[in-house]
Each structure stands twice: as C-alpha cells, then as structure tokens.
C-alpha cells in the first residue's frame, strides 16, 4: 500500500514515530510524508523552520514548496507536488489539515486530474459546532463530498461531521501515539530527592500550559480543600497564570507544597511524570475564544494522559471534551470546574493505595493496547484497508 500523508505536524521529527511504525507494519507498505518546506509555528517557537528531505527506505519525508507559512487552513503546495504524485502514485492521500483545508482540496483535484484513483482521507481535531459562510461552506462541502474516509481525533469531532451530513467511514483516533520506550514505569528516587519530595508525600502532577482553560485554578482550590493531607503539587509548564498560582499558594500557606518547573526537555518529561502519584488534567470548556467560523474551546484529546498511563501513573480528568473517552474506566473523572469533586478524587487516591495501583495498571494496559505509536499505526492501517476494500 502506497500512503501519502500531508501535514505541517511532521516538520517535528519526534511527531513522525507513528508513521515510521506504519511503514514497518507489513512488507509492501510505503509511507511518504509531505511537509511544507518552510513553516513558522508562532508562539514560543516563533521562527521559520526549514525542513529537509529524509529517505529511510519505506518511510520518506518530502519537503514541498508552500504558499502559507503559518496558517493551517491556508496551507497549499507548489508545482513540485505534481511530480511527487506522478512518481509515487499513492493509493491513500491523507491530509491532516481539517475539513476546510485548502491543501486537501488541492490534493483531491490533483488526484482526479492525474487519474490516480487514490482514496481521499482527512484528519480533524475540531470538536465544537460551527457555522460556515460562503465561500468556506462550499469548500468544506466539496472536501466532504470527495472524502472516502475521515479520521477524527475525538468523538465530538466525529459527531459534528455526521451532523454536517457526512455519511462515509469515520474513525476516532489520535493524531499521535505515545513512545512506550520513553514513557515507561521507572522510579526516580534521585530526582525526587533533588526536588525535595519525600517518600511519604503524595505527588499531584500537571503538565501543560498555565492558562485558565486548562483548569489549574480548580486544581489549586481542590488542593487547598485538603491542604492538611501530605501532598506536593508538581507543575510542568509555563503561562499567564504563573503569578496567580504563586499568589494563591502563598495566601493559603501551601507555597512549600508547590514545585514549578518551566522548562523541561521532552525526553525528560517521562522522568518527572514517574515522580507523580497521579496526573491531573482538569481542563474546562470555554467560549471566550473566537475564530472565523466558531466560538470556544474544549479539550480535544489530552495527550499527556496517555503518557502518564504508559508510566502506570493513575490519571484524574475533568469531563471536558475527549478526556472521559481517553480515560474510560482507567482513571477518575470529575465535572469540570468542580473543585470539591476533584478533591474527592484526590482523596480517594491518597487514602486508597490499592485503588491507585489498580487504576495505574488499567491505564497502562489501555495505553499499550490502544495508544502506542505502533497501536495507533495499526488502527490507522486497518482503516485504510477498510476504505480501499469499500
């Protein structure tokens, strides 16, 4: 099977491990990844990234000239895409830029013009209802009408596409898996000692941006409710709420229980997760954000959850977006924004070590079965086979 996948996501080599796993599943699978030659992510990485060609046999990364360097929806590719299509002749064309991506439209048209008869697939994370005006409504309608299958990163996204009239195959699957060789259970006594964490302290962990929608203030309130218990809060990340977090901690006399680490390299994150007795993702749905077509945000997946699960760390999550689906029965769920419900979850794990061990083991098994790079690649390959057979 010849598979062509296009996305700016794979500019970062670390994000390519699932696709490398895909290329190794069976003899005869070839994976060519199209990435923009130049891309400017914005945010903390506000610099232009120039990509390079890589040939690893059945897996290749091919930079193609592009016309937008920092907008997913407007990303389109140059004429060198035509020669790649003619040479590779893909059987699957999979574009990870959402339902309204111009690059997807471009590749659908090229597929038709070159007579490739490849199956068209796109990936989306979008999980809130939206309204479209012309000409964007026509663009999405065209893309949906010419899609043989869709992969949605979450169940809400799949439901929305059904509501918008799509009747073809949809698979719910994350864009990226977890590297189980990196995220694996491994005690960290030296790191714990370095951070001043003693053996009898229950470590509550959070990894992510310090922003309101990630629910950090609810987590702090929950911990203030149980401040007499023996715990420490380990926060990995940075963001606008840092000063408010420190202020609340000082006002409630829990500053000695707080550890903030702003800059941790990705290959060291697993070590810090292994310090945790639980990882909490207390995300909260918000309607403060606006785009051209929609208002709001809710958790689209929560990748850090599967990283913690792979380390046998029990997880607690709010019921925002995809979190309950990711966790299932392998962790604890609380209503978003409810600090009392969250402190109840925390208290259960602190007071019931057997429950914590059981949830850690359940989460580990689920991560190994569903969320490793190889497991995600296998599910993606089976979906491709399904739409080719149809």
List where the protein language model places each region.
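Donor nucleotide-sugar binding/catalytic pocket of nucleotide-sugar-dependent glycosyltransferases
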Residues: 35, 137, 144-188, 303
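Conserved acidic donor-binding segment of nucleotide-sugar-dependent glycosyltransferases
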Residues: 317-319, 332-339, 348-353
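Acidic donor-binding loop of glycosyltransferase active sites
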Residues: 274-298, 313
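A conserved nucleotide-sugar
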Residues: 194, 198-202, 216, 220-260, ...
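A short, histidine- and acid-enriched strand-loop-helix "catalytic/donor-clamping" loop
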Residues: 8-11, 98-102, 110-134, 146-149, ...
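A short, well-ordered alpha-helix in the C-terminal region of glycosyltransferases
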Residues: 348, 355-370, 381-382
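N-terminal subdomain of nucleotide-sugar transferases
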Residues: 1-59, 116
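Short hydrophobic beta-strand element within catalytic cores of glycosyltransferases
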Residues: 297, 305, 310, 314-317
């Amino acid at each position: 099977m010849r598979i062509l996948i296009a996305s700016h996501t794979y500019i970062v080599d670390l994000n390519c491990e699932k696709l490398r796993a895909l290329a190794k599943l069976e003899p005869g699978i070839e994976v060519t990844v199209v990435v923009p030659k130049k891309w400017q992510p914005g945010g903390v990485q506000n610099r232009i990234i120039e990509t390079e060609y890589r040939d690893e046999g059945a897996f290749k990364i091919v930079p193609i000239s592009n016309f937008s360097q920092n907008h997913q929806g407007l990303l389109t590719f140059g004429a060198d895409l035509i020669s790649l299509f003619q040479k590779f002749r893909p059987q699957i064309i999979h574009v990870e830029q959402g339902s309204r991506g111009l690059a997807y439209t471009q590749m659908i048209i090229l597929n038709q013009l070159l007579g490739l008869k490849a199956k068209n697939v796109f990936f989306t994370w979008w999980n809130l209802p939206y309204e479209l005006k012309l000409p964007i409504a026509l663009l999405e309608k065209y893309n949906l009408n010419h899609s043989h299958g869709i992969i949605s990163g979450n169940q809400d996204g799949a439901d929305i596409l059904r509501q918008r009239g799509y009747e073809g195959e949809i698979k719910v699957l994350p864009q990226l898996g977890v590297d189980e060789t990196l995220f694996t259970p491994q005690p960290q006594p030296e790191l714990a000692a370095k951070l001043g964490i003693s053996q009898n302290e229950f470590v509550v962990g959070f990894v992510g941006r310090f922003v309101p929608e990630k629910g950090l203030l609810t987590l702090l309130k929950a911990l203030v409710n149980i401040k007499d218990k023996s715990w420490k809060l380990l926060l990995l990340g940075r963001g606008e709420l840092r000063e408010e977090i420190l202020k609340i901690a000082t006002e409630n006399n829990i500053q000695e229980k707080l550890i903030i680490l702003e800059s941790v390299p990705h290959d060291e994150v697993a070590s810090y997760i292994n310090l945790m007795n639980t990882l909490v993702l207390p995300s909260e749905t918000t309607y403060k954000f606006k785009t051209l077509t929609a208002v709001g945000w809710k958790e689209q997946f929560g990748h850090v959850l599967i990283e913690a699960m792979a380390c046998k760390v029990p997880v607690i999550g709010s019921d925002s977006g995809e979190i309950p689906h990711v966790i299932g029965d392998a962790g604890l769920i609380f209503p978003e924004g409810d600090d009392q419900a969250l402190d109840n979850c925390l208290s259960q794990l602190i007071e019931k070590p057997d429950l914590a061990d059981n949830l850690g083991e359940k989460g580990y098994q689920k991560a190994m079965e569903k969320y490793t790079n190889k497991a995600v690649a296998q599910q993606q390959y089976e979906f491709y086979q399904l739409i080719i057979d149809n």
